[in-house]
């Protein structure tokens, strides 16, 4: 092994970006097959490949950052910039969906009866399950902040409790969203209202599932004493991501559920 005279991490070749990209292709193709041909084989293959990739990629990053000490302060600063850019790209991703919604709702076309919501579509009551979902996500934002402050103060017990509550709130939100989809009187095929509603809320729900998985990984790592008060960027990135999901939901609730109804 050659002697390293700098603080940067020279990453070893890894197969996980390739398998991750292939699993994403399999999942999107599998979704198309499921929607049109009611076949879940390709979707299940993509999900399995994606879960295996996540597990092994996270394992390698934990080894490099926690056990081998490659995540120096300089590397952590670069990772922070990377996470900020990633969240910025996610903001632009959701901007497209909000643009589609406002483009259609602010000036409804004659095909929609020049009316919003379109005639025949009965939107969900924003003061029922959507308001409960808003409360759940806002509460999870409080608990993730509690977990972060507990970690900074070296209070491991409180950190684990707060993080577990956040994960459970994320799971509860997902279950409520599934119930809402089941009870909705319209589908993704019901014109521009149905498509913008389900695509926007669906992608947000997917981000909640990803965020919950991220937090669950941090919970397991904290059980194994991986985090300290001054070396915990993995958890910090998960907290940033979770706050981003919270903010997107607030815009989504105010735009689609409350104003759009």
UniProtKB/Swiss-Prot annotation:
Keywords: Membrane, Mitochondrion, Mitochondrion inner membrane, Translocase, Transmembrane, Transmembrane helix. It catalyses: 4 Fe(II)-[cytochrome c] + O2 + 8 H(+)(in) = 4 Fe(III)-[cytochrome c] + 2 H2O + 4 H(+)(out). Its EC number is 7.1.1.9. The keyword Translocase applies. Residues 35-40, 106-128, 184-190, 257-261 are mitochondrial intermembrane. Its main location: mitochondrion. Residues 1-15, 67-72, 153-155, 224-232 are mitochondrial matrix. It is a multi-pass membrane protein. One of its GO terms (molecular function) is cytochrome-c oxidase activity. It is found in: Mitochondrion inner membrane. It holds the Pfam family COX3. GO terms for cellular component: mitochondrial inner membrane; respiratory chain complex IV. The chain crosses the membrane at residues 16-34, 41-66, 73-105, 129-152, 156-183, 191-223, 233-256. GO terms for biological process: mitochondrial electron transport, cytochrome c to oxygen; respiratory chain complex IV assembly. Belongs to the cytochrome c oxidase subunit 3 family. Component of the cytochrome c oxidase, the last enzyme in the mitochondrial electron transport chain which drives oxidative phosphorylation. The respiratory chain contains 3 multisubunit complexes succinate dehydrogenase (complex II, CII), ubiquinol-cytochrome c oxidoreductase (cytochrome b-c1 complex, complex III, CIII) and cytochrome c oxidase (complex IV, CIV), that cooperate to transfer electrons derived from NADH and succinate to molecular oxygen, creating an electrochemical gradient over the inner membrane that drives transmembrane transport and the ATP synthase. Component of the cytochrome c oxidase (complex IV, CIV), a multisubunit enzyme composed of 14 subunits. The complex is composed of a catalytic core of 3 subunits MT-CO1, MT-CO2 and MT-CO3, encoded in the mitochondrial DNA, and 11 supernumerary subunits COX4I, COX5A, COX5B, COX6A, COX6B, COX6C, COX7A, COX7B, COX7C, COX8 and NDUFA4, which are encoded in the nuclear genome. This is Cytochrome c oxidase subunit 3. It comes from Loxodonta africana (African elephant). The lineage of its organism: Eukaryota, Metazoa, Chordata, Craniata, Vertebrata.
């Amino acid at each position: 092994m050659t002697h390293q005279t700098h603080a940067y991490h020279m990453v070893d070749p890894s197969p996980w970006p390739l398998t991750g990209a292939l699993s994403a292709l399999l999942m999107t193709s599998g979704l198309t097959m499921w929607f049109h041909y009611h076949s879940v084989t390709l979707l299940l293959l993509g999900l399995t490949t994606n879960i295996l990739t996540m597990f092994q990629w996270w394992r390698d990053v934990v080894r490099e950052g926690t056990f081998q000490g490659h995540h120096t302060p300089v590397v952590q600063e670069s990772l922070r910039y990377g996470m900020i850019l990633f969240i910025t790209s996610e903001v632009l991703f959701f901007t497209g969906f909000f643009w589609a919604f406002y483009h259609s709702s602010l000036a409804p076309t004659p095909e929609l009866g020049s009316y919003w919501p379109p005639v025949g579509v009965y939107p969900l009551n924003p003061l029922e399950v959507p308001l409960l979902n808003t409360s759940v996500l806002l509460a999870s934002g409080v608990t993730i902040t509690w977990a972060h402050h507990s970690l900074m103060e070296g209070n491991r017990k409180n950190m684990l409790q707060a993080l577990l509550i956040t994960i459970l709130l994320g799971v509860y939100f997902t279950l409520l969203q599934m119930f809402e989809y089941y009870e909705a009187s319209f589908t993704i095929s019901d014109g521009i209202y149905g498509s913008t509603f389900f695509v926007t809320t669906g992608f947000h729900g997917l981000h909640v599932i990803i965020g919950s998985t991220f937090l669950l990984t941090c919970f397991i790592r904290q059980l194994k004493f991986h985090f300290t008060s001054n070396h915990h960027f993995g958890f910090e990135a998960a907290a940033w991501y979770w706050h981003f999901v919270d903010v997107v939901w607030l815009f989504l609730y105010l735009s689609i559920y409350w104003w759009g109804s």
